[in-house]
Amino acid sequence: MEGYFEKEFVLTPDYCDARAGLSPYGAFTIFQAIATEHAERIGVGGAAMAKRGEFWLTVHSRVDFVGRAHLMQTLNAKTWPEPCDETSIRCFRSYSLTCGDTPVALGRTQWAILGPEQKVVPFGQSGFPRDFPFTGEAGITAAPVRFRDDFAPEDFVRTYTVRPTDIDFGQHMNNVAYIRVLLDCFSAA
């Protein structure tokens, strides 16, 4: 078992923006895809969690673009969970995207495990295997930013009706769907 997972992705049009470069939506989709595949490989993926009535819940996500990648270039995506103790109810998973030797994006997601009866489960009870070889690598190290949630009516940009295709197996709106809704608030120009 390795403490990280790497995979190559060809930057196809579905990962690109109007300038034929990697889009925020595309980067987030790649990061979620490799996290999912890595979790399955180490025994804490959706299938194993579902057997226990649990699922991974994204608490915060951040993607920092540090370079550009363009249509049909090959990207190397890497992910690794950050160490957390057994009593933690949240942990971080980091990501990087490179094009050759050039860094393109860094990502970091804070996760929790939601168990039966919608209760948060400490990682010592259900998270990573006890002997998991955490790498100690660091990506984005800044603490997650919290936004105020006392919005006034003039703060609202648009309404959105959640579609069945937005819902994941945890019966919540999928994380990537939030990114798509947010980006749809802006014009492509």
Predicted regions and their residues:
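Hot-dog-fold acyl-thioester-processing enzymes
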Residues: 1-58, 106, 112-189
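Hydrophobic beta-sheet segments that form the core/acyl-binding groove
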Residues: 61-100
